[in-house]
Amino acid sequence: MTEQQPVAVLGGGSFGTAVANLLAQNGVPVRQWMRDPEQAEAMRVNRENPRYLKGIRLHDGVEPVNDLLATLHYSDLIFVALPSSALRSVLAPHAGLLRGKCLVSLTKGIEAQSFKLMSQILEEIAPDARIGVLSGPNLAREIAEHALTATVVASEDEDLCQRVQAVLHGHTFRVYASSDRFGVELGGALKNVYAIIAGMAVALGMGENTKSMLITRALAEMTRFAVSQGANPMTFLGLAGVGDLIVTCSSPKSRNYQVGHALGQGLTLEQAVNRLGEVAEGVNTLKVLKAKAEEVQVYMPLVAGLHAILFEGRTLNQVIERLMRAEPKTDVDFISISGFN
């Protein structure tokens, strides 16, 4: 049997830990780097990530570490699970070590200052690296508990996709491939905003019709925006689009859903985020997405409505009334409507 090449995972959160465990279960030696030396030591001793994945045993093949330079030297396949706000500051000082390596982003976020996706930041930091993204309906705890799960690895580099499939694909985790890196990654980032809306709707006792309407109109809205930026609309009918949107907008395990649910219960945004105790990328994404949609003149009423509630002092009832009074458009944007003429 061929010995597996070592792999690195950057980030000590729930998803980074779940992916590290998956790799180790497939016989891959893994170093999982995190900034907090106390967290690394506790995970190494107790074989658990109590803050982010309490009750899930850390596989013996995962080595939690705090030495970033040694970790970057360790492997030429690196999964990057850093918060969007930290990715650039962590990796830019070590750009030279990333040359020629395979960097796969696991982070579903957008950089506020530039509106760049995480893989685009990786490209900027390390133009000679091979870049990919992993995205889909992937709740970290369910992955860690071996629930049947599928995901998408996306890259223009077919060999990179095949390599990621080889190390991650297993009995409970299926890995599909796509060449639409931008569309796959954008879908993962955009759906976080709509999960906040869905969580609010549930907390407020809205009906199943309402929740279904929100999810399908969210899909139309995020697809419309993505296509304006050059993505393939068909990507949004797959795991990284509608698949990720459904699970994130339906599950109390979703961090962004939890924030929305707390808001619907009457908490302030600050209180909701503090109660979560983790990063909810949707809050940051909402701000930059609202500005970008206005800049490129893409109609995104759900984004505008949530922004009005969280940052403009509008009430939910005011926003709902405005949304329901808006002129209804066609149901699906990307099919011929000539029959209506």
UniProtKB/Swiss-Prot annotation:
Name the UniProt key words of this record, in alphabetical order. Answer: Cytoplasm, Lipid biosynthesis, Lipid metabolism, NAD, NADP, Nucleotide-binding, Oxidoreductase, Phospholipid biosynthesis, Phospholipid metabolism
Query: What molecular function terms (GO) are annotated for this protein?
Result: glycerol-3-phosphate dehydrogenase [NAD(P)+] activity; NAD binding
The superkingdom listed in its UniProt entry is Bacteria
Coarsely, its chief localization is cytoplasm
List positions binding sn-glycerol 3-phosphate.
108, 136, 191, 244, 254-256
Pathway(s): Membrane lipid metabolism; glycerophospholipid metabolism
Does the UniProt entry include the keyword Transmembrane?
A: no
| Residue sites binding NADPH per the record | 14-15, 35, 108, 140, 255, 279, 281
Enzyme class of the recorded protein, top EC level: oxidoreductase
Q: Where in the cell is it found?
A: Cytoplasm
Q: Does the keyword Zinc-finger apply?
A: no
Q: Name one GO biological process term.
A: glycerol-3-phosphate catabolic process
| Xref: PROSITE patterns | NAD_G3PDH
User: Which family is it part of?
Assistant: Belongs to the NAD-dependent glycerol-3-phosphate dehydrogenase family.
Q: Which HAMAP family match?
A: NAD_Glyc3P_dehydrog (MF_00394)
Q: What is this protein called?
A: Glycerol-3-phosphate dehydrogenase [NAD(P)+]
Give the species: Pseudomonas putida (strain W619)
Query: Gene symbol?
Result: gpsA
